[in-house]
């Protein structure tokens, strides 16, 4: 027992297969012509055109409608099939079909496809022979009917037409082509020479720039070595200065608390980084000057309490 929509599904499958065949034909034709293409774009354009033609011409609805009629007949519903049979046998339907055929003929004529071409295409088919340049011409059923009705004539007369051959001065043509070739060759050589000169100039500028860069890199390396040497010398000088001050501090008759405080400040000096070491020395000198100022103020106050005067010499 067939399903109710089996014929409609087959018709839809045939339509979809026809669309896929159209896409394959379009892409294979583009490949044979050596044209690059985007498959998605070709697929979209062919689908849009195919859907429009099938829908606008009514072919899709006609096929699906006939398939639906067949499904109904297969399932025991012959009313639609009877109506279609009566419609096909109606004189009005025949007149409409005849009118459509006439419209199609006029449309073909407007496209440049005249009666001779239409008749010949309807009477003959060409079959290609694989692997050969020759082909086989096959007569259609229409051609057989015309032969049976005596509508085919054989023309045995042979008309010899003289073929007019234009005399071509190949020598002058060759000379013209040779002049054009020499002119083109000269222009190409001039452009090539100009390009070579520009390329040489660019190479010279590039080599000159490379030499300048190399010299600058050498100078930078020398300056870097000099800076490293200065930094090492400063580190050694700062370390020697700290050691000398510590030794001198130990030889002084200062209290141990003061010596310890000064030693801590000396030990906090950054011997590695000269910039930080200078800042540390500045802080140490400021502290020493501040302590000296305080001692001087204390000494000045003490002398006033003892009714003494002081002078600088």
From Swiss-Prot:
Spans annotated as Interaction with ZC3H7B: 170-234
Domain of life from the UniProt record: Viruses
Region (Interaction with host EIF4G1): 208-313
InterPro entries: NSP3_N_rotavirus, NSP3_sf, Rotavirus_NSP3
Coiled coil regions in record: 166-237
Chain segments carrying region Dimerization: 150-206
Pfam family, one: Rota_NSP3
Subcellular localization(s) per the UniProt record: Host cytoplasm
UniProt keywords, alphabetically: Coiled coil, Host cytoplasm, Host-virus interaction, RNA-binding, Translation regulation
Region described as Interaction with host ZC3H7B: 170-234
Keyword set includes RNA-binding: yes
KW Transferase (keyword) present: no
Any single GO CC term annotated in Swiss-Prot or TrEMBL for this entry: host cell cytoplasm
Region (RNA-binding): 1-149
CDD domains: NSP3_rotavirus
GO BP field: regulation of translation
Listed GO MF terms: RNA binding
Subunit (UniProt): Homodimer. Interacts (via the coiled-coil region) with host ZC3H7B (via LD motif). Interacts with host EIF4G1.
Protein family per UniProt: Belongs to the rotavirus NSP3 family.
The protein's role, per its UniProt record: Plays an important role in stimulating the translation of viral mRNAs. These mRNAs are capped but not polyadenylated, instead terminating in a conserved sequence 'GACC' at the 3' that is recognized by NSP3, which competes with host PABPC1 for EIF4G1 binding. The interaction between NSP3 and host EIF4G1 stabilizes the EIF4E-EIF4G1 interaction, thereby facilitating the initiation of capped mRNA translation.
Name the UniProt record assigns to this protein: Non-structural protein 3
Organism this protein belongs to: Rotavirus A (strain RVA/Cow/France/RF/1975/G6P6[1]) (RV-A)
């Amino acid at each position: 027992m067939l399903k109710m929509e089996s014929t409609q599904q087959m018709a839809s499958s045939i339509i979809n297969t026809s669309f896929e065949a159209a896409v394959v034909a379009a892409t294979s034709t583009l490949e044979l012509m050596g044209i690059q293409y985007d498959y998605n774009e070709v697929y979209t354009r062919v689908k849009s055109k195919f859907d429009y033609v099938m829908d606008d011409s009514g072919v899709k609805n006609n096929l699906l409608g006939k398939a639906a009629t067949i499904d109904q007949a297969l399932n025991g519903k012959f009313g639609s099939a009877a109506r279609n049979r009566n419609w096909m046998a109606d004189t009005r339907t025949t007149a409409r079909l005849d009118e459509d055929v006439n419209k199609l003929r006029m449309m073909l004529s407007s496209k440049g496809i005249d009666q001779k071409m239409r008749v010949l295409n309807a009477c003959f088919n060409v079959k290609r022979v694989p692997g050969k340049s020759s082909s086989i011409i096959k007569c259609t059923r229409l051609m057989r009917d015309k032969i049976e009705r005596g509508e085919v004539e054989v023309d045995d007369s042979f008309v010899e037409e003289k073929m007019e051959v234009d005399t071509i001065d190949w020598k002058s043509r060759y000379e013209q082509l040779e002049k054009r070739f020499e002119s083109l060759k000269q222009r190409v050589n001039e452009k090539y020479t100009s390009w070579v000169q520009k390329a040489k100039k660019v190479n010279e500028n590039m080599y000159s720039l490379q030499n300048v860069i190399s010299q600058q890199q050498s100078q930078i390396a020398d300056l870097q070595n000099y800076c490293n040497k200065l930094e090492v010398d400063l580190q050694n000088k700062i370390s020697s200065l700290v050691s000398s001050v510590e030794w001198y501090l130990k030889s002084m008759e200062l209290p141990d608390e003061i010596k310890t405080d000064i030693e801590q400040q000396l030990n906090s000096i950054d011997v590695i980084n000269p910039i930080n070491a200078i800042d540390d020395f500045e802080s140490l000198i400021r502290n020493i000057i501040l302590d000296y100022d305080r001692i001087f103020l204390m000494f000045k106050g003490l002398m006033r309490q003892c009714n003494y005067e002081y002078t600088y010499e």
